[in-house]
Each structure stands twice: as structure tokens, then as C-alpha cells.
């Protein structure tokens, strides 16, 4: 486990590699408020979501846009969201993702992220996805809001 701040640094490095590969065919905006930076997340949990947004969302576009941001839901959970303006996730895949079923023939990264989160934190956490109004998709992770100090205390038991 690492802080969200550290995870975002890893995402920045991953995006630098993708910028070499894709040039200026997409832009990625990271918009995570300071109050979430010290939350603890599983290491490399966001990379598959960003990779999925690039490969399935904007790789075939000349004007791709990806946004990653964090929110707190009404129950106090951390929501990490990755949105793109691509062609969107097919409805049958959305249905399987949102019911936490394995998706045959692809989306292995999303399945793995969902399983890691659900095994680590329980059934109230995990991955969900939905279409964006203007096109594209948004994939959301729901995690407990644990600060680095809280997590360290919890693992000393």
C-alpha cells in the first residue's frame, strides 16, 4: 500500500511513457485535492484504469481527453474516478463490470483491480463504470478513506 500522492507520481511516469508513444493525441488531467493525497491505496491500482482509458478510450482519437479525480461519497468513502471521451464501454460489458462478473475476452485489468479492492476492503468497495453524457466512459473505484497513519496503525495488530 502507498499514499495516493505516491500513486499519482507513478501515474505521471506512466503518462510520460504514453506521451512518447501517442504524442499529443490525448491529454490527461489529474485533479486530486490535497486532502486526499495522504489516503492509502493499493499500489498500482490506478494504472490499469488509466491504461484502459488510453487503449480503449482515446488511442484511436486525435483529440482524446482523460481526467482522473477524487471525491468523498456521502458515506465517507474515497472515490477515484477515471473518465475519457472515447467510444465508451459497451452496455453488456458495463453490466458485467457493475455486477462484478469476470468479462471474457478482455478487460482483465479492470477485473483484477475490482478483485483486489473487494478482497482487500470487502463487498462495499470495488470498481463500477458508467457512460458519460457526452460520450466515453467513467470508471470509479470506491475505497475506504484511510490516511497513512490510520493504515499503519491498523497493520500493526
Give the location of each predicted region.
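Two-component histidine phosphotransfer core
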Residues: 1-130, 136-138
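Short C-terminal beta-strand
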Residues: 137-146
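Gram-positive cell-envelope targeting signals
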Residues: 151-155
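Charged/polar, low-hydrophobicity segments characteristic of intrinsically disordered regions
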Residues: 89, 146-150
Amino acid at each position: 500500500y502507498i499514499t495516493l500522492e505516491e500513486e499519482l507520481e507513478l501515474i505521471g511516469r506512466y503518462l510520460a511513457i504514453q506521451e512518447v508513444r501517442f504524442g499529443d493525441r490525448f491529454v490527461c488531467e489529474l485533479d486530486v485535492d490535497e486532502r486526499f493525497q495522504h489516503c492509502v491505496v493499493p499500489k498500482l491500482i490506478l494504472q490499469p484504469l488509466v491504461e484502459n482509458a488510453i487503449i480503449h478510450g482515446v488511442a484511436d482519437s486525435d483529440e482524446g481527453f482523460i481526467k482522473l479525480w477524487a471525491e468523498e461519497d456521502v458515506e465517507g468513502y474515497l472515490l477515484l474516478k477515471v473518465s475519457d471521451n472515447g467510444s465508451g464501454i459497451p452496455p453488456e460489458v458495463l453490466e458485467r463490470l457493475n455486477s462484478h462478473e469476470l468479462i471474457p475476452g478482455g478487460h482483465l485489468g479492470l477485473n483484477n483491480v475490482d478483485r483486489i479492492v473487494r478482497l482487500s476492503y470487502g463487498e462495499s468497495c470495488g470498481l463500477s463504470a458508467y457512460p458519460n453524457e457526452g460520450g466515453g466512459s467513467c470508471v470509479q473505484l470506491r475505497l475506504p478513506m484511510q490516511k497513512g497513519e490510520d493504515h499503519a496503525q491498523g497493520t500493526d495488530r
